Amino acid sequence: MKSILIIGMGEFGKHLANRLVELKAEVCVVDKNKDIIKVLAEQFENAYVADCTQDIALRDFGIHNFDACVVAVGKDFQTSLVITSKLKEQKAKYIIAKASDDLQSKFLIMAGANETVYPEKDVATKIAQKCIANNLLDMFAISDDYSVFEFNVLDEWVDKALKNTNIRAKYKLNVVAVRDGDDIIAPEADYIFKATDTVFAFGKTSTIKRIIK
Protein backbone atom coordinates (compact mmCIF):
# COMPACT_ATOMS: atom_id res chain seq x y z
CA MET A 1 0.00 0.00 0.00
CA LYS A 2 1.36 3.40 -1.01
CA SER A 3 1.64 6.04 1.71
CA ILE A 4 1.01 9.65 0.70
CA LEU A 5 1.39 12.86 2.70
CA ILE A 6 -0.77 15.80 1.58
CA ILE A 7 0.05 19.24 2.96
CA GLY A 8 -2.67 21.85 2.45
CA MET A 9 -6.31 20.83 2.53
CA GLY A 10 -8.01 23.27 0.21
CA GLU A 11 -10.32 21.96 -2.50
CA PHE A 12 -7.48 20.37 -4.48
CA GLY A 13 -6.01 18.69 -1.41
CA LYS A 14 -9.39 17.34 -0.31
CA HIS A 15 -10.29 15.94 -3.71
CA LEU A 16 -6.86 14.36 -4.05
CA ALA A 17 -7.06 12.78 -0.60
CA ASN A 18 -10.51 11.35 -1.27
CA ARG A 19 -9.41 9.87 -4.58
CA LEU A 20 -6.29 8.33 -3.05
CA VAL A 21 -8.38 6.69 -0.34
CA GLU A 22 -10.65 5.26 -3.04
CA LEU A 23 -7.51 3.82 -4.64
CA LYS A 24 -6.60 2.16 -1.33
CA ALA A 25 -3.61 4.38 -0.53
CA GLU A 26 -2.66 5.21 3.04
CA VAL A 27 -3.19 8.97 3.29
CA CYS A 28 -1.97 11.47 5.88
CA VAL A 29 -3.52 14.95 5.60
CA VAL A 30 -2.08 18.09 7.17
CA ASP A 31 -3.21 21.70 7.41
CA LYS A 32 -2.33 24.54 9.76
CA ASN A 33 -6.02 25.44 10.14
CA LYS A 34 -7.39 23.49 13.10
CA ASP A 35 -11.00 24.02 12.03
CA ILE A 36 -10.35 22.33 8.69
CA ILE A 37 -8.62 19.38 10.35
CA LYS A 38 -11.39 19.06 12.93
CA VAL A 39 -13.82 18.37 10.10
CA LEU A 40 -11.45 16.12 8.15
CA ALA A 41 -10.58 14.06 11.24
CA GLU A 42 -14.02 12.48 10.94
CA GLN A 43 -13.13 11.28 7.45
CA PHE A 44 -9.40 10.55 7.58
CA GLU A 45 -7.71 8.45 10.24
CA ASN A 46 -4.48 10.44 9.94
CA ALA A 47 -5.38 14.14 9.99
CA TYR A 48 -3.10 16.61 11.75
CA VAL A 49 -2.77 20.31 12.51
CA ALA A 50 0.76 21.50 11.79
CA ASP A 51 2.71 24.41 10.35
CA CYS A 52 4.88 22.59 7.83
CA THR A 53 7.14 25.59 7.31
CA GLN A 54 8.68 24.58 10.65
CA ASP A 55 11.36 21.86 10.66
CA ILE A 56 10.16 20.29 13.89
CA ALA A 57 6.65 19.76 12.49
CA LEU A 58 7.95 17.90 9.45
CA ARG A 59 10.36 15.80 11.50
CA ASP A 60 7.45 14.53 13.57
CA PHE A 61 5.88 13.02 10.44
CA GLY A 62 8.93 10.98 9.42
CA ILE A 63 8.95 12.40 5.91
CA HIS A 64 11.29 9.74 4.51
CA ASN A 65 8.70 7.05 5.25
CA PHE A 66 6.16 8.37 2.71
CA ASP A 67 6.19 7.19 -0.89
CA ALA A 68 5.22 10.70 -2.01
CA CYS A 69 4.61 14.10 -0.47
CA VAL A 70 2.17 16.52 -2.11
CA VAL A 71 2.41 20.25 -1.45
CA ALA A 72 -1.16 21.38 -2.11
CA VAL A 73 -0.98 24.79 -0.42
CA GLY A 74 -3.40 27.30 -1.95
CA LYS A 75 -2.52 30.89 -2.82
CA ASP A 76 0.56 31.43 -0.65
CA PHE A 77 3.34 30.59 -3.08
CA GLN A 78 6.11 31.55 -0.64
CA THR A 79 4.78 28.93 1.78
CA SER A 80 4.77 26.32 -0.99
CA LEU A 81 8.41 27.09 -1.76
CA VAL A 82 9.46 26.85 1.88
CA ILE A 83 7.63 23.56 2.47
CA THR A 84 8.99 22.06 -0.75
CA SER A 85 12.53 23.01 0.22
CA LYS A 86 12.18 21.58 3.72
CA LEU A 87 10.70 18.33 2.40
CA LYS A 88 13.76 17.99 0.17
CA GLU A 89 16.07 18.65 3.12
CA GLN A 90 14.33 15.90 5.08
CA LYS A 91 14.90 13.33 2.33
CA ALA A 92 11.38 13.07 0.94
CA LYS A 93 11.33 10.27 -1.64
CA TYR A 94 9.17 12.11 -4.16
CA ILE A 95 7.71 15.63 -4.00
CA ILE A 96 4.74 16.82 -6.04
CA ALA A 97 3.92 20.52 -5.73
CA LYS A 98 0.92 22.53 -6.91
CA ALA A 99 1.73 25.43 -9.24
CA SER A 100 -0.37 28.10 -10.91
CA ASP A 101 1.89 28.82 -13.87
CA ASP A 102 5.19 27.90 -15.53
CA LEU A 103 7.20 30.40 -13.49
CA GLN A 104 5.96 28.95 -10.20
CA SER A 105 6.69 25.48 -11.53
CA LYS A 106 10.27 26.47 -12.35
CA PHE A 107 10.91 27.79 -8.84
CA LEU A 108 9.27 24.77 -7.18
CA ILE A 109 11.48 22.42 -9.20
CA MET A 110 14.51 24.46 -8.15
CA ALA A 111 13.36 24.21 -4.52
CA GLY A 112 13.28 20.43 -4.73
CA ALA A 113 10.00 19.29 -6.29
CA ASN A 114 10.25 16.24 -8.53
CA GLU A 115 7.04 17.15 -10.32
CA THR A 116 4.56 20.03 -10.45
CA VAL A 117 0.86 19.99 -11.27
CA TYR A 118 -1.48 22.71 -12.51
CA PRO A 119 -4.99 21.78 -11.28
CA GLU A 120 -6.72 24.89 -12.63
CA LYS A 121 -4.91 24.70 -15.98
CA ASP A 122 -5.60 20.97 -16.32
CA VAL A 123 -9.30 21.42 -15.60
CA ALA A 124 -9.54 24.33 -18.05
CA THR A 125 -7.82 22.27 -20.76
CA LYS A 126 -10.15 19.34 -20.17
CA ILE A 127 -13.27 21.53 -20.32
CA ALA A 128 -12.06 23.24 -23.49
CA GLN A 129 -11.45 19.89 -25.18
CA LYS A 130 -14.89 18.63 -24.16
CA CYS A 131 -16.53 21.81 -25.48
CA ILE A 132 -15.14 21.31 -28.97
CA ALA A 133 -15.40 17.51 -29.09
CA ASN A 134 -18.91 16.21 -28.58
CA ASN A 135 -17.64 12.64 -28.41
CA LEU A 136 -15.10 13.30 -25.68
CA LEU A 137 -16.23 12.43 -22.16
CA ASP A 138 -12.96 12.76 -20.27
CA MET A 139 -9.21 12.85 -20.67
CA PHE A 140 -6.32 12.13 -18.33
CA ALA A 141 -2.90 13.59 -19.11
CA ILE A 142 -0.10 11.06 -18.70
CA SER A 143 2.62 13.47 -19.84
CA ASP A 144 2.88 16.69 -21.82
CA ASP A 145 2.32 14.76 -25.06
CA TYR A 146 0.24 11.69 -24.17
CA SER A 147 -3.21 11.19 -22.63
CA VAL A 148 -5.86 8.57 -21.97
CA PHE A 149 -9.17 9.55 -23.59
CA GLU A 150 -12.67 8.40 -22.70
CA PHE A 151 -15.11 8.94 -25.56
CA ASN A 152 -18.35 7.60 -27.01
CA VAL A 153 -17.77 4.77 -29.46
CA LEU A 154 -17.54 6.11 -33.00
CA ASP A 155 -20.48 5.26 -35.26
CA GLU A 156 -18.18 3.50 -37.72
CA TRP A 157 -17.02 1.07 -35.01
CA VAL A 158 -20.48 -0.11 -33.92
CA ASP A 159 -21.09 -3.83 -34.61
CA LYS A 160 -17.45 -4.25 -35.63
CA ALA A 161 -14.79 -6.30 -33.89
CA LEU A 162 -11.93 -4.32 -32.36
CA LYS A 163 -9.47 -6.04 -34.70
CA ASN A 164 -11.44 -4.84 -37.74
CA THR A 165 -11.67 -1.15 -36.86
CA ASN A 166 -8.15 -0.18 -37.92
CA ILE A 167 -8.00 2.06 -34.84
CA ARG A 168 -4.24 2.04 -34.44
CA ALA A 169 -3.48 2.86 -38.06
CA LYS A 170 -6.26 5.40 -38.67
CA TYR A 171 -6.49 7.15 -35.31
CA LYS A 172 -3.07 6.44 -33.75
CA LEU A 173 -4.83 5.15 -30.62
CA ASN A 174 -4.48 2.03 -28.48
CA VAL A 175 -7.75 0.88 -26.89
CA VAL A 176 -7.08 -0.05 -23.25
CA ALA A 177 -10.62 -0.53 -21.92
CA VAL A 178 -14.31 -0.35 -22.79
CA ARG A 179 -17.15 0.68 -20.51
CA ASP A 180 -20.07 -1.67 -21.16
CA GLY A 181 -22.92 -0.48 -18.96
CA ASP A 182 -21.65 -0.59 -15.38
CA ASP A 183 -18.69 -2.81 -16.29
CA ILE A 184 -15.26 -1.77 -17.49
CA ILE A 185 -13.49 -4.51 -19.44
CA ALA A 186 -10.18 -5.02 -21.21
CA PRO A 187 -11.43 -5.96 -24.69
CA GLU A 188 -10.04 -8.87 -26.68
CA ALA A 189 -9.31 -8.43 -30.37
CA ASP A 190 -12.65 -10.01 -31.29
CA TYR A 191 -14.72 -7.75 -28.98
CA ILE A 192 -17.77 -6.36 -30.83
CA PHE A 193 -18.48 -2.69 -30.13
CA LYS A 194 -22.01 -1.70 -29.09
CA ALA A 195 -23.63 1.67 -29.76
CA THR A 196 -23.81 2.31 -26.00
CA ASP A 197 -20.11 1.64 -25.33
CA THR A 198 -17.60 4.22 -24.20
CA VAL A 199 -13.97 3.67 -25.06
CA PHE A 200 -10.75 4.34 -23.14
CA ALA A 201 -7.80 4.81 -25.48
CA PHE A 202 -4.18 5.88 -25.07
CA GLY A 203 -2.38 8.09 -27.55
CA LYS A 204 -0.86 11.47 -28.30
CA THR A 205 -2.90 14.35 -26.93
CA SER A 206 -2.99 15.86 -30.42
CA THR A 207 -4.93 12.76 -31.50
CA ILE A 208 -8.04 14.35 -30.01
CA LYS A 209 -8.51 16.09 -33.36
CA ARG A 210 -9.08 12.70 -34.95
CA ILE A 211 -12.09 11.85 -32.77
CA ILE A 212 -13.82 15.24 -32.74
CA LYS A 213 -17.39 15.02 -33.99
For each of these PLM feature ranges, what is it?
Residues 1-213:
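Cytosolic regulatory regions of ion transport systems
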